A protein has these predicted regions:
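Active-site mouth loops of central-metabolism enzymes
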Residues: 8, 95-112, 135-140, 160-164, ...
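Hydrophobic faces of well-ordered beta-strands that scaffold small-molecule active sites
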Residues: 95-101, 123-127, 161-163, 179-183, ...
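Glycine-enriched alpha-helix->loop->beta-strand junction motifs that scaffold or abut catalytic
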Residues: 121, 173-182, 198-204, 225-231, ...
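Glycine-rich, proline-tolerant flexible connector loops at the mouths of alpha/beta enzymes
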Residues: 126-144, 301-311
Length: 337
């Protein structure tokens, strides 16, 4: 990073800045101009010391040279892809549909829905065995029984399974059944959980927190990458704004912005953003047009009887009608589905 000294900074103040930088174990290089002095700070922990240096007398501004997210940054490496089972997600791959119910409710239910979504074109099965609910009295999921049902659905259909992990203590159990770990919106800032999934052998689908900035999301991904897991997928799932016409606002600008800043696959979840079945198809089409590498769409064969979020799940008929429209949009931007 670069430290810009104030125009009236004294030589004593400049030397104190240099001394402090070197006390942090960093290298300081002074460059003297006609009216300003700048100090180049070099070292792996330079950005971590930014606030301490900025508070010193004689400092006008700090200019970071490198991004604080080193592992997630796109830089010159281009886009990467992530394998979930035998399905690859990424900028240079086909657009993928990740579909299924909000919650696994029974063996019969998940087997039926898995078959339906596969026949319509889905390539990955989603389903919650552990459910983070606003109310403690709401359905919390079937836990390991639900995981077993998901594994049976995978065996029947061949669809790899994505399911949410909420507690690091449940991770070993979930790893026995799942093909991908989902970190939900409420846990995007759960750094203990991020570190644990970062040590997992499974890929991680990281959802943006509903009050998180794009920078926050990337830094949460950095936690996972820093623990050694390179297989991270970013998911835009809606943010909380002043408007309450829908549950959240699906921030589709995040898709191209994230792609410009990171090499990680970026997907969208219009179901949870809207919370209303009637608007999910339109926003699904818009997400593909924005460049999303995959869509997460909830589908339920009896949404009126669903134990969670039935009003946002597409019926099999609506889902089947949406597929050719999604493929047409993908083709229009030079991609396949």
């Amino acid at each position: 990073m670069i430290v810009i000294a104030q125009p009236n900074a004294t030589e004593e103040q400049i030397q104190r800045i240099v001394t402090r930088v070197r006390e942090f174990g960093l290298e300081a290089q002074i460059s003297r101009g006609a009216s300003r002095v700048i100090i180049g700070v070099i070292g792996p922990e330079a950005l971590l010391r930014e606030k301490a240096i900025a508070a010193m007398r004689g400092v006008e501004a700090i200019v970071p040279v490198l991004k604080p997210y080193k592992l997630a940054a796109r830089d010159s490496r281009g886009a990467s892809s992530v394998a979930i089972g035998d399905v690859r997600l990424g900028e240079h791959e086909d657009v993928v549909l990740i579909c299924g119910p909000c919650s696994v409710e029974s063996k019969e239910q998940i087997l039926s829905i898995a078959t339906i979504v596969k026949e319509s074109g889905a390539r990955i099965l989603r389903g919650g065995a552990f459910k983070p609910r606003t109310s403690p009295y709401s359905f919390q999921g079937l836990r390991e029984e639900g995981l077993r049902f998901l594994a049976e659905a995978r065996a029947k259909t061949g669809l790899p399974v994505v399911t949410e992990v909420m507690d690091p203590r449940d991770l070993p159990m979930i790893e026995k059944y799942a093909d991908c770990l989902q970190v939900g919106t409420r846990n995007m800032h759960n750094f203990s959980l991020l570190k644990e999934v970062g040590r997992s052998r499974l890929p991680v689908l990281l959802k943006r927190g509903f009050s998180a900035t794009i920078y926050d999301l990337i830094m949460s991904a950095e936690y996972i990458l820093n623990e050694g897991n390179p297989n991270v997928v970013l998911c835009e799932r809606g943010i909380r704004t002043f408007d309450n016409a829908a549950r959240y606002t699906l921030d589709l600008s995040a898709v191209p912005i994230l792609k410009s800043k990171t090499h990680l696959p970026v997907i969208a979840d219009p179901t949870h953003a809207l919370g209303l079945r009637e608007f999910v198809p339109q926003m699904s089409l818009a997400a593909v047009a924005a460049g999303a590498d995959a869509l997460m769409i909830e589908v339920h064969d009896s949404p009126e009887q669903a134990k969670s979020d039935g009003n946002q799940a597409l019926t099999p008929e609506i889902f089947a009608e949406l597929i050719p429209r999604l493929r047409a949009v993908a083709a229009a931007i030079g991609r396949e589905m």
